[in-house]
């Protein structure tokens, strides 16, 4: 305390010895080192008090501007605290002291300088100030996300609940200065470097990922306003740092995903912001009207970047719904009128010249995520929007790509459409849409590809055939075959083979009549090209294949399905029996059940 030069020398030596623990780059995972920095008890007596006074002196001199030596000392102090926090046993004690408040005060002043556009700033080297800011933000990360959960998440490593429960040390309590600091940093920040904004977003994500208590304190109306404004600022993107701009948007969306997940695990009295409010602002931004922008701003390059942002936002919806409380979040999405917003996005995107297909693919992915394994969501979509409407909207975008058609196939099986045999039909409506779209496809190769896949997925087992028959697929196929001049011969053969398989399951007299009418020609002397394949189909329907099976049966596939036997009021004896035939369909293997024990149905 009496010899500042010796103190600086000691700090230099300490920081040099443990420099590998600094890990200032948020984009990189922390360095794994066997050794750890010393605990506080092993440091010289009163060293923390001395350092606190040194920091306080720096704060007091900020108004007049720090000299070069004082700037170097303040940076050394922050590095020292980062290193100390890498010994997780020190985090709680350091967090309880006033160091972080002093550091935030200095950082706020520096960021104000970096945000300004003055001649003095342009003539002065800003590197020392930027270096301090980066280290200050990492110091805060060390306090509030000691296990670097956010960095793990950014790198694609998702920690399970069990792994999180094994984290022995808790993060320090979040300082009340953080929310005002974070909000102020993004006020009038057009001259602040995008890389520093990314660091601020990294810190926010780290606080939310570090622990629920701090997350609920950080997730406030002010911070949510900042995140939404960062996304909305895409209008002012320039050509100087497009990669950093894109990364900023990506980090903001990852922060929002983390926020939604943390809000789902909290009670209403703990939350400052409701998930529904976030989604309302999110969809409003996703569907914002940019047609009023002046033409110079709406250049082709700007359109490309804006659509890229919309695609990122759509993909984020899928990421948000990838959580343990998915049914709860799906209900919140439904209450936020997400289907209407997503369909409106497809309708409005026609103002742009290109990238329509990519946007349509991402929109279908988002719709699939909202409806995934939720009969209620599927019913809501059917009632509010309807597949006839989405068909018209998609058709208005022009000829579809293979990727878009494959996404509709994925929607039908709620998984990878190539896993035929592993996945059955979860949503039959997209299949009807694909059948209806076949005559409109100019590409014959796409017609053959789609029809061949439809034939395989719809006929894979008894359950799939029953699902398709109950959805009136037979009539839809016959209607499509009526446009035979627009269909490739192989496509027509696949559809007729599909008819034969579905007809062997069930076919009404009206459907059979429609099939026969299909063979009429305007010229009596010329046979219809479908005569031979249709006759084969009719023979396949009539032919008995395998063991005779019941024409009517109960479907007990659903986990909650069962047969209720009426209660017996008077027992004829000591017990009673209930007889039923059981048919086990072995064609379908559910991958989700492959690693689990078998299910058992009980009779109540």
PLM regions: where:
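Elongated alpha-helical scaffolds that mediate protein-protein interactions in large eukaryotic proteins
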Residues: 1-535, 540, 544-546, 591-592
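Short carbohydrate-recognition loop motifs
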Residues: 541-557
